[in-house]
Amino acid sequence: MASLFDALEAEAFRKGIQARSIEASKLFMKNVAKLGPQTKAILKDERLTTKNKPFIGDMIMYTYNPKFKKTLPYYDMFPLTIMVGPAPGGFYGINLHYLPPKIRAIFLDHLNDTATNQKFNKTTRFKITYNLLKATKKYKYFKPCFKHYLSEHISSNIMKVNASEWNIAIFLQTAKFKKKSDTFVWVQSKKEYQ
């Protein structure tokens, strides 16, 4: 089966669009919108790497069943998370689904400044901490996205998104918000980072 990531990259190449450019981001956003929700298919994508234990700075995807879902106003069952650090019973992470796609792209562009290298390959990670995010104005978008995830409530394999696919992954329609729509969540998030 052809990888979704491969198909999107191939179209950009055919159109002469350079990888990791603004034009590539716009093309990916447009094409992914046509695809519709991709949650189940993405877990089978060959370009993602299964990780038993992800590292701090990895971008990861997984199915999540929150411990306190009955009291949460809304939650995402398929987070796209950048792992920030360890936490009691799990880890702290930035779930990018809490931002609308255009803001995700802006935020990712800022976060790329923290990449451990500019190769954007399997070894590349984000080098971020809560204190860095909190202290730096350009990282203000992290506020509504910063979550505590409990390991025992992860109900699928953890899939690592390699750095070469970060710009594509942020546009995939994999969010699975419960109780409220994506749009509602994004409006609430905007109140936190404005």
Name each model feature, range by range.
Residues 2-60, 68:
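Mixed-charge, Lys/Arg-rich low-complexity intrinsically disordered regions
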Residues 55-56, 86-90:
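A short, compositionally biased
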Residues 58-62, 81-83:
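Short hydrophobic/aromatic-rich beta-strand motifs
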Residues 63-68, 97-100:
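Short regulatory "switch" loops immediately downstream of catalytic or recognition motifs
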Residues 69-88:
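Short beta-strand-centered aromatic/proline hotspots
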Residues 89-97:
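Short, solvent-exposed secondary-structure boundary/capping segments
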Residues 98-194:
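Intrinsically disordered, low-complexity, charged/polar segments
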